[in-house]
Design a protein with these regions (language model features):
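Catalytic-core elements of nucleic-acid end-processing and repair enzymes
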Residues: 1-123
Length: 123
């Protein structure tokens, strides 16, 4: 799904967590069932239309087990919810703040690279 999202959002410096980019509608449905949230509804279509980015936050030791569902808008965390739309643990909130700063740096770097390419083409 959307390769440019993979390179932007997937890598993280976290020791305890993994960010998973869902690959299919079934991934969304499974996340919604396991975390008892609404991500299995219309979020798949919204993501395909680039209206939002959904990521699944996992504990590294349990990468296949639903933990938190995250909605991003660029480098901004729109929402990060645990099971049954509960507030995630404080350490997750801290991680998400660090993660959003990492994403902001990547976005700035991409923009600088695009600008450099435009300048090259113009010359």
């Amino acid at each position: 799904m959307l390769p440019e999202l993979r390179s932007l959002y997937m890598k993280t410096k976290a020791d305890d967590y993994l960010m998973i980019l869902p690959e299919s509608k079934e991934d969304f449905n499974r996340e919604g069932r396991e975390n008892h949230n609404c991500v299995g509804g219309s979020y798949f279509d919204k993501m395909l239309q680039r209206k939002c980015t959904i990521l699944f936050l996992r504990k590294k030791e349990e990468p296949d087990k639903a933990f938190c569902t995250v909605e991003m808008d660029g480098d901004r965390v729109v929402q990060c919810r645990a099971v049954r739309n509960s507030t995630p643990p404080e350490e997750v909130t801290d991680f998400m703040q660090r993660y959003s700063r990492e994403i902001a740096v990547r976005i700035r770097k991409r923009q600088q690279e695009k600008n450099a390419q435009r300048i090259k083409v113009a010359i």
